[in-house]
């Protein structure tokens, strides 16, 4: 994955300040990625497909933009990747760019064990993690640029797919596969409904409660919990889902 990972850090000028052959120009910044891909492709052999998740934009000022990201994607094709998963964002700088919506701060801090971190994030969290509005298939416009530029291998679209109508649109636009996360967490049987219902749409309300608890306990939809949530969290979730 090139979404805030070690390879991502190496090929961004924002995080790569090296002065040697691994820094400076995009060609140099991609050198480490090339080395990793060479080893991965050698290890994979003919036994498995290698899919690489790569950014289209980082989503913050000074991060990688689409023109350079297309060049990175083309290099991954040259390096032997069998398919690319097109994403965006940078976990430490622009987490909601990839997730979209708002971060439920009360839910996030509810599961933190460290008291000073809990209260600190409650005080400044909304400024630390700014909201990025959600819309269905929010990465599609950028992904179409990659589809135009890259013809050699399959592309996997990910980002805000919650209905059969939009999934069909993405596939009709030339993407071989789609990837879903929160839609399936909300409704594990959603794929079965997609097969039989033309108007199928999952019931995810995009409160991001599942994301808020992901790093401290586990990832779960609030609609499928065995325990009852505190009233303050229920109100926070309801407010976000009704925005």
Regions from the language model: what does each represent?
Residues 44-50, 80-82, 151-155, 175-176:
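Short, well-ordered coil/turn segments that N-cap beta-strands
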Residues 10-33, 61-67, 72, 98-136:
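Glycine-rich tight-turn/loop motif centered on a GG-T
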Residues 55-67, 156-157:
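Active-site mouth loops of central-metabolism enzymes
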Residues 33-41, 69-74, 140-147, 167, ...:
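Generic structural signal for well-ordered alpha-helices
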Residues 40, 52, 76, 84, ...:
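Conserved, mostly hydrophobic/aromatic
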Residues 2-9:
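Short, small-residue-biased leader/transition segments that mark boundaries at the very start
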Residues 94-243:
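Extended, intrinsically disordered, low-complexity segments
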Residues 53-56, 86-88, 159, 182:
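A cross-domain feature marking catalytic cores of carbohydrate-active enzymes
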């Amino acid at each position: 994955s090139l979404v805030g990972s070690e390879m991502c850090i190496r090929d961004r000028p924002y995080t790569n300040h090296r002065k040697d052959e691994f820094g400076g120009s995009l060609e140099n910044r991609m050198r480490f990625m090339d080395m990793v891909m060479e080893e991965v492709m050698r290890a994979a052999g003919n036994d498995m497909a290698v899919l690489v998740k790569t950014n289209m934009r980082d989503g913050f000022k000074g991060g990688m933009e689409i023109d350079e990201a297309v060049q990175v994607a083309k290099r991954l094709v040259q390096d032997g990747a069998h398919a690319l998963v097109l994403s965006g964002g940078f976990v430490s700088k622009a987490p909601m760019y990839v997730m979209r919506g708002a971060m439920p701060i009360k839910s996030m801090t509810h599961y933190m064990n460290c008291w000073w971190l809990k209260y600190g994030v409650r005080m400044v969290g909304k400024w630390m993690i700014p909201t990025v509005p959600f819309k269905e298939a929010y990465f599609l416009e950028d992904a179409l640029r990659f589809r135009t530029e890259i013809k050699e291998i399959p592309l996997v679209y990910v980002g805000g797919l919650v209905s059969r109508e939009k999934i069909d649109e993405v596939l009709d636009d030339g993407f071989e596969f789609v990837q879903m996360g929160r839609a399936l967490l909300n409704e594990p049987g959603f794929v079965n409904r997609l097969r039989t219902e033309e108007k199928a749409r999952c019931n995810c309300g995009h409160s991001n409660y599942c994301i808020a608890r992901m790093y401290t306990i586990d990832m779960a939809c609030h609609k499928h919990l065995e325990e009852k949530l505190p009233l303050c969290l229920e109100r926070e979730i309801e407010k976000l889902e009704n925005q």
